[in-house]
């Protein structure tokens, strides 16, 4: 049976204010929002029902904002574990440590997607000062827990000339590109 992937935005809460983010765009800036726990449960079971009807296996990409900031983040991971549903988290590095990564792995997290949008100066301008170094540091943290650390880059005219060196940097830090 084939997988059907759901990218699930559970919260707008985020520690960064990325230049290219739709949540905090100047003309669309709005109050931060998040799904309630009952909404999350309903959505989860609706996705499972969909997959049953279409003979697919569910796979979730949990994102936001930074999903780890959602007050029901661990409840959601518990629900995933209870139903043996594989998932990837697309989030920030700031709340990761060995304990958090170990716990995510216990719940079944397969991959954690981090973002690097250029070398230090460019990336920190895009996202938040200190984010570049923190992101590289957390690759090792994720890997120690047995979670694949993958890196995504939003390529633009601002960073395109840095991409070859960025790839070398990510490979040197042993990301699971």
Segments and roles (model prediction):
Residues 102-106, 127-129, 165-168:
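Short low-complexity, flexible loop/linker segments enriched in glycine and/or proline
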Residues 104, 108-119, 175-177:
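Non-cysteine beta-strand/loop elements that form the S-adenosyl-L-methionine
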Residues 28, 67-69, 93-98, 112-129, ...:
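Conserved radical SAM core fold
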Residues 35, 39, 115, 131-134:
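Short acidic-hydrophobic sequence patches enriched in Asp/Glu that either
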Residues 16, 121, 149:
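Glycine-centered loop/turn positions within well-structured domains
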Residues 9, 50-62, 81-88, 110-111, ...:
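Conserved C-terminal portion of the radical SAM core fold
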């Amino acid at each position: 049976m084939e997988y059907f992937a759901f990218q699930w935005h559970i919260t707008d809460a985020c520690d960064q204010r990325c230049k290219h983010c739709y949540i905090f765009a100047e003309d669309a800036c709005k109050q931060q929002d998040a799904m309630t726990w009952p909404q999350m449960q309903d959505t989860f079971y609706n996705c499972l029902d969909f997959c049953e009807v279409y003979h697919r296996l569910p796979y979730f990409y949990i994102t936001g904002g930074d999903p780890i900031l959602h007050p029901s983040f661990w409840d959601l991971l518990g629900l995933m574990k209870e139903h043996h549903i594989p998932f990837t988290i697309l989030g920030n590095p700031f709340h990761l440590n060995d304990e958090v990564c170990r716990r995510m792995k216990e719940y079944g997290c397969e991959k954690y997607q981090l973002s690097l949008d250029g070398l230090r100066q460019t990336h920190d301008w895009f996202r938040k000062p200190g984010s570049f170094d923190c992101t590289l540091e957390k690759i090792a943290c994720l890997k120690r827990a047995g979670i694949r650390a993958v890196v995504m880059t939003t390529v633009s005219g601002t960073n395109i000339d840095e991409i070859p060196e960025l790839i070398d940097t990510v490979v040197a830090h042993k990301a699971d590109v």
